[in-house]
């Protein structure tokens, strides 16, 4: 049976929670000119996950890789079994690769295999990652770090000041904390 994106998502989320413990999953997040299929928030990092099911092609992947590499600390390509052998050719060596396979066609159970572990992305830009945060979340990080609020300045100005002032390792942790605590009900 050929796997589609919808067949992979929920079992993938369970696999990631088993593998990493505390995670927050955000689906379909715009970043640059691409949309991340899945954003996985970890305690000190944010990972981007691109799903290429058996029904997908690699046509847009080149552009997607460039966008993912600007925003995320780690990146994963999750592929259906038809792409498992060729997947390495399409992403940089720091990208992790996970294969999703349906062992028994009679059962909707998937097995996931790590083909390659993700390594820290050398091109990630903390300023790009800060753009994922809402203005209130940025204000909270400013407060935590004793920064002036700059309430009349643009979001880009505030992000630039934060990146200049707060050590990156602290920002990585604080960005994750804000995303873990985000309450989507406040704006629904």
Enumerate the predicted regions with their spans.
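General N-terminal leader/first-domain-start detector
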Residues: 1-2, 148
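Active-site metal-binding core of divalent-cation-utilizing nuclease and nuclease-like domains
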Residues: 3-43, 161
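Conserved N-terminal glycine/acidic-rich loop preference
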Residues: 31-46, 88-105
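Short acidic loop-to-helix transition motifs that present clustered carboxylates
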Residues: 33, 55-56
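Active-site ExK catalytic segment of metal-dependent nucleases
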Residues: 45-54
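Catalytic cores of nucleic-acid endonucleases
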Residues: 56-99
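Non-catalytic C-terminal interaction segments of nucleic acid-processing enzymes
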Residues: 96-188
